[in-house]
Structure formats: C-alpha cells, structure tokens
Curated annotation (Swiss-Prot):
Residues 1-22 form a propeptide. The chain crosses the membrane at residues 5-25, 35-60. This is Pre-early 3 receptor internalization and degradation alpha protein. Prevents infected cell apoptosis induced by the host immune system. Acts by down-regulating a number of cell surface receptors in the tumor necrosis factor (TNF) receptor superfamily, namely FAS, TNFRSF10A/TRAIL receptor 1, and TNFRSF10B/TRAIL receptor 2. Down-regulation of these death receptors protects adenovirus-infected cells from apoptosis induced by the death receptor ligands Fas ligand and TRAIL. RID complex also down-regulates certain tyrosine kinase cell surface receptors, especially the epidermal growth factor receptor (EGFR). Changing residue 31 to S: Complete loss of disulfide bonding. GO terms for cellular component: host cell endoplasmic reticulum; host cell membrane; membrane. The keyword Oxidoreductase does not apply. It comes from Human adenovirus C serotype 2.
C-alpha cells in the first residue's frame, strides 16, 4: 500500500497549483496597477514553482519507497523481520 502522506502531499501541491491558476485566469489586468500585476504574477510563479518542487519530491519519495520494498522482498524469508516490515509499511 502506498503511504498516505505521499498521496496527500501530491494532492495538496496539485490543488495549490490549480487553484492559483484558476484565480489568476479571472483577473482583469486593465483594472490593476502595473506593480500589483507584476507582484501578483510573481506570487503565482512562486506558488507554481513550489508546487512543482513538492510534486517532484513526492515522486522521488515514491520511487525510494518502491525500491526499498523490492529490496526487502528479495531477501530470503528467514531474514525478513516483521517489525522492520511494519516500520517501513511494506507488508
């Protein structure tokens, strides 16, 4: 079973990115002063970069989790420790 934290982290990052883009899509730039527009687009860029980095980190953690699971399950059954498997949430 995939750890819930990875799924939750990915969903939160994607929600932040999508909600930011949806909010910016409805802004009329003609009614706002130029500095405010640049500041707003700067914040949008920052949020999107942070969301992208969060998704990449969650993906790397998922790959690491899969590799640990494969390495653990390759061991001979007599060397498998149930407490380690519970700790890593492998079985």
């Amino acid at each position: 079973m995939i750890p819930r934290v990875l799924i939750l982290l990915t969903l939160v990052a994607l929600f932040c990115a999508c909600s930011t883009l949806a909010a910016v899509a409805h802004i009329e730039v003609d009614c706002i002063p130029p500095f405010t527009v640049y500041l707003l687009y700067g914040f949008v860029t920052l949020i999107l970069i942070c969301s992208l980095v969060t998704v990449v980190i969650a993906f790397i953690q998922f790959i690491d989790w899969v590799c640990v699971r494969i390495a653990y399950l390759r061991h001979h059954p007599q060397y498998r420790d149930r407490t380690i498997a519970d700790l890593l949430r492998i079985l």
